[in-house]
Regions:
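Hydrophobic alpha-helical transmembrane segments
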Residues: 10-20, 23-30, 76-77, 105-119, 163-176, 179-185, 201-209, 344-346, ...
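Hydrophobic alpha-helical segments
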Residues: 333-342, 346-434
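N-terminal "leader" segments that precede or initiate the main folded domain
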Residues: 1-105, 109, 114, 195, ...
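Hydrophobic, aromatic-rich transmembrane alpha-helices
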Residues: 18-30, 171-185, 355-370, 424, ...
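Membrane-embedded catalytic interface detector for glycan/lipid assembly enzymes
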Residues: 2-11, 91-232, 254-263
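Small-residue-enriched transmembrane helix-hairpin modules in multi-pass membrane proteins
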Residues: 3-8, 138-161, 251-365
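Membrane-interface helix-loop-helix junctions at transmembrane boundaries of multi-pass membrane enzymes
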Residues: 30-37, 179-194, 368-380
């Protein structure tokens, strides 16, 4: 852009912000209940607001081109398609979850707990920064972050920390199971307390490595999980979860603030740290508008389906450095945020991505229709999967890309087990019960 944004640019970005406010009002017009869909739409309103701010920042607007109407329209349609399962559940909320009667669901939770506690000694001894250092040393967060970036640049070809891999792969699904267990009448309180501690560890460990992104992702996952099951939790459990959530947010906020200051305080231009924070939160909508639909080529699934492609084609890039080098002809890469929609558009093109979104979410809508006033756990898992994609990727990129394709595999296995187990119960009621 090189200069202040034009009136048209501001009309478009403000219009995009207002359409999400209108969507939020429409979403709650008939049914006032706040749920997971409310959280996702609310986050999109926030991101659009910060897009307005960073677009008009005299330091950052030189990074942007002038905005166009069609990309914003396309982005809105794609995000609404991705949200369609949550919207359907909002207006067709069953009052009861059918219990799958499976003790097997404890297995991934136990694996998460074990892997979480195995990581603690390594994280503490191997970290460049302790929690105290992050708060007191202005350079500690930056040093830890640079160390992690160096490690990631060489990652993708081998497993260096098996407990961390297991933990990260299981985190989203076990968060889902944690909130489901809270809805049951007979609760193992000690088990739930230990599982909660393991989930909280998932927010602490990235802080020690100077990472904000992983903490934010974990927090958004917890918010989605709680909001999805909130309707089925007792008033007392809701209160306890809300108090625990506020406490977690306070504990995490201090080191995250310190990391942010450490990362951006030495950079010139803009309004200090705040300008970089606004750019960090608000850039995705603008970069999507500028380049995601017309980047000068596509990546053929090398990011969104990276691990699956590597099983078939050995020349598939193993990490983001290799991928950026391979597709250096594109106008934009994954150094910048373009939302999860942008990731798919860059991988497959806007037309193919539309059909991928439409067909997948149509299948989900067909599958999640509740019957007899109850909803099954595998149906809720599908909705949770789509919500995590929407919530985690609304500000950044597709969160299940690269080696995180393994998380999709875990989702599939859990979904298949829940469906198979229920079918077995119907066919052999006594043999299937655990």
């Amino acid at each position: 852009m090189g200069n202040m944004p034009s009136l048209t640019d501001n009309i478009l970005v403000v219009g995009y912000f207002l359409i999400w406010i209108a969507t939020f009002l429409w979403y709650h017009h008939i049914k006032k209940e706040v749920d997971a869909g409310s959280m996702v739409i609310g986050s999109y309103i926030g991101y659009a607001f910060f897009s307005i701010i960073t677009l008009n920042d005299t330091f950052f607007n030189i990074r942007y081109d002038h905005l166009r109407f069609i990309p914003f329209l396309y982005l809105y349609i794609m995000l609404m398609i991705a949200l369609s399962p949550a919207i359907y559940l909002h207006y067709n909320q069953p009052d009861k979850i059918e219990d799958p009667h499976s003790k097997t669901l404890y297995i991934p939770c136990i694996a998460l707990i074990i892997s979480a506690f195995f990581q603690i000694p390594t994280a503490i001894s191997g970290s460049e920064s302790s929690m105290i250092q992050l708060i007191t040393d202005a350079d500690a967060g930056q040093n830890a972050y640079l160390e992690q970036i160096s490690n990631k640049a060489e990652s993708g070809s081998s497993i260096k920390n098996l407990p961390a891999v297991i933990f990260n792969v299981l985190y989203d699904c076990t968060t889902f199971l944690f909130f489901y267990f809270l809805t049951r009448k007979n609760k193992n309180k000690l088990f739930l307390l230990v599982l909660f501690a393991a989930i909280f560890i998932g927010m602490i460990l990235p802080v020690l490595n100077g990472q904000r992104g992983s903490v934010i992702k974990a927090a958004l996952t917890i918010v989605v999980g709680y909001a999805l099951f909130r309707h089925y939790l007792s008033k007392r459990i809701n209160r306890v979860v809300q108090i625990a959530g506020i406490t977690m947010a306070i504990i995490i906020a201090i080191p995250i603030t310190a990391i942010t200051i450490s990362r951006f305080s030495d950079r010139k231009g803009s309004d200090g740290v705040s300008g970089y924070v606004y750019w960090y939160i608000g850039q995705a909508n603008i970069y999507f508008n500028n380049s995601a639909m017309s980047a000068g080529g596509i990546r053929y699934g090398d990011r969104t389906l990276n691990l699956f492609k590597r099983l078939i084609w050995s020349d598939t890039p193993k990490n983001y450095d290799e991928r950026r080098d391979k597709y250096r002809n594109l106008e934009i890469d994954d150094y910048y945020f373009t939302t999860f929609v942008g990731d798919f558009a860059l991988d497959f093109g806007p037309i193919a991505s539309f059909f991928i979104f439409f067909i997948f979410n149509l299948c989900v809508l067909f599958e999640i229709r509740p019957r007899d006033g109850t909803i099954k756990l595998h149906q809720l898992l599908l909705i949770y999967f789509t919500l995590c994609i929407c919530m985690q990727g609304g500000m950044v990129l597709f969160s299940y890309a690269d080696t995180a394709n393994l998380i999709i595999v875990v989702y599939f296995l859990l979904y298949a087990w829940l469906r198979y187990h229920e079918a077995l119960l119907k066919r052999f009621p006594l043999a299937g019960k655990e």
